[in-house]
């Protein structure tokens, strides 16, 4: 993961410049530049130390940092009490300075103290990063957990990311427009949260899983460039990178090409990255979907390391080696930390089988007694010298390397090898930095349904590649879409596409998907009706703010960059949500809980 950035630079600077109310200064503004000045500071007691009968040292923490205060009295104080201290800034005695703090050269001495609020014993230390309790305890007391410097930094960094995105897009002429939170059901793939209507009994709104259709309607409405930092809801199974409610940057623009859209997003993400980490001038290379699958076995490859996959089927065609004489033979040099033991190789074979492969072949490159290269492999006796030489040359292998290979159908081999490559690379290599990648030219369709109709890879409004229109009905799985994904360190940040604005093309896509005119009008009638009034060519993109913030903050889970997240089972441990509601409230919506649900 990316090393954590210094927290909240811009927001803290704004605070330091604008103290108000009960305080004259924030903690981090109490420096050697104001020695001799009288100041008042407010915050929480981070620690308290008594020296003798008449001296108390307090570390006062506020939202900007910590400052040491010296009270010439012995007072009963406890951690996390809220206090106000008034005193004079003086230089710390020699040898007691703390160079890690902005205020570490000084202290507030001869101070008077006012207790603003007492606190119960906290369930865990706010200052301790190592010995944190179970995440459930942290989420139950999230208001305490959020006092920790790491989470304070994360939330502030996230705010800077949003600020940078807004500034970047508005420099391109984008307009921030809010779209409805109560929306009509649309089949966009994920399960939606339903909201009953009290005034229209028996009818329901849904909470939007994305503003996809709304933003296209804005293009028809003549708003040339739209964006929104949008709250979205999906009632789906949760994991480390998912929440029921999430935030995404949503963007749409008229009269643009996909290159234009990628330029907008590249600049916005670059600016957000610089705001969060200080890094600038990062590269955003692009590869096609087919190239990504062929070289990395994934449509979201982690390019922080090489170890690319090479095709070897031509080398073994007609060789008679059954395990290798297959339509596709993919191979890569396994990322290693030290030497692979035989037991580790056996584990990799089992892992490949668990991923769906018939097996996994391995070749350990070694030097023979005569200086030539040889291989240690379960099928070594079947390999000719020219096979070994070509494997070494094609993959760039050297003595000690282990080559892993899977044979079979192309798509299946690449899927297994891509997973192994990612798992081994992240486990065995020191991966640092941020590596963005655009993946373009995705398939328009993925697989066939039970009726033999192609399944839309994204949504049915994605524009096909102009060169592939003629394949729509003859070979739909070969049709490429004008769609594109942005990947960071092997994580898909978001995706976008050029949309269909031509009713004829839209009709053809619906027909290819097996969607009749009647069903299309039932599902999307209001959008299709709008397109009949003049729709501009348009395209857009959306990416997850939560995921981007987690990656830029060096966190493994998005829960660490969300103020009040749910658990992986969708519970809010702090508030107790979700909860039952009163029977009369249910009745006002025309709802009742069935007996089977009561027992569930």
Regions found by a protein language model. Give the residues of each.
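Class II aminoacyl-tRNA synthetase catalytic cores and aaRS-like
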Residues: 1-600
């Amino acid at each position: 993961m990316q090393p954590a950035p210094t927290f909240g630079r811009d927001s803290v600077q704004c605070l330091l410049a604008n103290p108000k109310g009960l305080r004259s200064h924030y903690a981090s503004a109490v420096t050697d530049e104001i020695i001799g000045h009288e100041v008042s500071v407010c915050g929480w007691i981070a620690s308290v130390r008594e020296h003798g009968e008449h001296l108390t040292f307090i570390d006062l923490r506020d939202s900007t940092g910590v400052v040491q205060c010296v009270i010439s009295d012995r007072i009963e104080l406890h951690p996390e009490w809220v206090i106000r201290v008034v005193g004079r800034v003086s230089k710390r005695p020699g040898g007691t300075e703390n160079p890690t703090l902005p205020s570490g050269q000084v202290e507030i001495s001869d101070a008077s103290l006012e207790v603003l609020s007492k606190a119960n014993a906290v369930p865990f230390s706010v200052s301790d990063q190592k010995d944190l309790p179970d995440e459930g305890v942290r989420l139950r007391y999230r208001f305490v957990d959020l006092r920790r410097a790491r989470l304070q930094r994360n939330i502030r960094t996230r705010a800077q990311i949003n600020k940078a995105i807004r500034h970047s897009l508005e420099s391109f002429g984008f307009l921030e427009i809010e779209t409805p939170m109560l929306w009509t059901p649309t089949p966009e793939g994920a399960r939606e949260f339903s909201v009953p209507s009290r005034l229209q009994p028996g009818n329901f709104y849904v909470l939007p899983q994305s503003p996809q259709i709304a933003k296209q309607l804005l293009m028809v409405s003549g708003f040339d460039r739209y964006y929104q930092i949008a709250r979205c809801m999906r009632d789906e199974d949760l994991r480390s990178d998912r929440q029921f409610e999430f935030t995404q940057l949503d963007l749409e623009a008229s009269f643009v090409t996909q290159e234009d859209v990628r330029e907008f997003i590249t600049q916005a993400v670059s600016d957000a990255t610089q705001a969060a980490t200080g890094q600038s001038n990062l590269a955003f290379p692009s590869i096609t979907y087919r190239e990504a699958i062929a070289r990395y076995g994934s449509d979201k490859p982690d390019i922080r390391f090489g170890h690319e996959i090479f095709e070897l089927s031509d080398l073994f065609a007609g060789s008679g080696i059954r395990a290798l004489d297959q339509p596709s033979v993919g191979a890569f040099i396994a990322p290693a930390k030290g030497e692979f033991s035989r037991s580790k190789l056996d584990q990799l074979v089992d892992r490949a089988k668990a991923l769906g492969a018939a097996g996994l072949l391995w070749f350990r490159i070694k030097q023979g007694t005569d200086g030539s290269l040889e291989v240690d492999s379960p099928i070594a006796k079947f390999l000719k010298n020219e096979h070994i030489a070509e494997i070494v040359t094609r993959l760039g292998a050297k003595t000690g390397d282990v080559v892993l290979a899977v044979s079979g159908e192309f798509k299946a081999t690449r899927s297994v090898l891509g997973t192994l490559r990612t798992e081994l690379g992240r486990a065995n290599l020191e991966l640092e930095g941020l590596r963005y990648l655009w993946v373009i030219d995705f398939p328009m369709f993925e697989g066939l349904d039970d009726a033999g109709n192609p399944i839309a890879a994204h949504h049915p409004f994605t524009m096909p590649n102009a060169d592939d229109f003629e394949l729509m009905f003859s070979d739909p799985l070969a049709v490429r879409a004008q769609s594109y994904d942005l990947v960071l360190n092997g994580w898909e940040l978001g995706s976008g596409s050029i949309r269909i604005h031509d009713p004829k093309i839209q009709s053809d896509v619906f027909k290819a998907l097996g969607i009749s005119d009647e069903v299309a009008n039932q599902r999307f009638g209001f959008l299709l009706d709008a397109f009949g009034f003049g729709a501009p060519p348009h395209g857009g993109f959306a990416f997850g703010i939560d995921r981007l913030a987690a990656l830029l903050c060096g966190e493994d889970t998005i829960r660490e960059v969300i103020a009040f997240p749910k658990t992986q089972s969708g519970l809010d441990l702090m508030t107790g949500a979700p909860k039952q509601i009163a029977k009369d409230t249910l009745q006002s919506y025309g709802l009742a809980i069935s007996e089977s649900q009561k027992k569930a």
